[in-house]
Design a protein with these regions (language model features):
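Acidic-basic catalytic patches of nuclease active cores, encompassing PD-(D/E)XK
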Residues: 2-50
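Short acidic/glycine-enriched loop/turn segments that link adjacent beta-strands
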Residues: 52-54
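Conserved protein-kinase catalytic-loop segment immediately C-terminal to the catalytic Asp
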Residues: 56-57, 123
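Active-site beta-strand-loop-beta-strand hairpin of nuclease catalytic cores
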Residues: 58-76
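Residue-level signal for beta-strand positions within conserved beta-sheet cores that form or flank
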Residues: 63, 113, 129-132
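Short hydrophobic-acidic sequence motifs that mark active-site Asp/Glu residues
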Residues: 64-68, 116, 135
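Catalytic cores of nucleic-acid endonucleases
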Residues: 70-126
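Short, low-complexity, polybasic intrinsically disordered segments
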Residues: 118-142
């Protein structure tokens, strides 16, 4: 866990499916649940509870991944993946790295060899009956 690497972006993937997470009216919590559902849909597993409403802890294969969820207001429904990437500055990366390391230290098992921090934006447009999710993998990785 002592070496930080630069991540090469992956090719954007567009997938559509019917969301099943209920909408409760608590926008931040709803966005976190929709992010969890979207990540599950693309193979993320073993979700764990975190003390933060806007942070998910899960795994992609054996890799522990900590995910920040950015709830985007409906006015930002046209936000693109590039827009999300532009919001990930040094402060976000440092915060993500700290979340990853804190999660690793709080776990009961041995420290993992690798950690990763991702960022997911979620925008719910109830009028259109649509949700837009963007996922930046590897905003930080050790």
């Amino acid at each position: 866990m002592s070496q930080t690497t630069t991540i090469t972006p992956t090719v954007p993937v567009r997938e559509l499916w019917e969301a099943t997470a209920p909408v409760t009216g608590d926008y931040a919590r709803d966005c976190a649940e929709l992010a969890r559902e979207a990540l599950s849909h693309v193979g993320f597993t073993r979700f764990e509870e975190t003390p933060f409403e806007d942070v998910l802890a899960c795994r992609e294969g054996d890799l522990p991944v900590t995910v920040a969820v950015l709830p985007v207001p409906v006015e930002g429904f046209e936000m693109t993946l590039a827009d999300l990437e532009s919001l990930i500055d040094e402060d976000v990366v440092a915060h993500g790295a700290a979340l990853c390391v804190g999660r690793a230290l709080a776990s009961d098992g041995p420290l993992p060899e690798r950690l990763r921090f991702d960022v997911v934006s979620v925008c719910v447009n109830l009028d259109a009956g649509r949700v837009r999710v963007h996922h930046v993998r590897g905003a930080w990785q050790s």
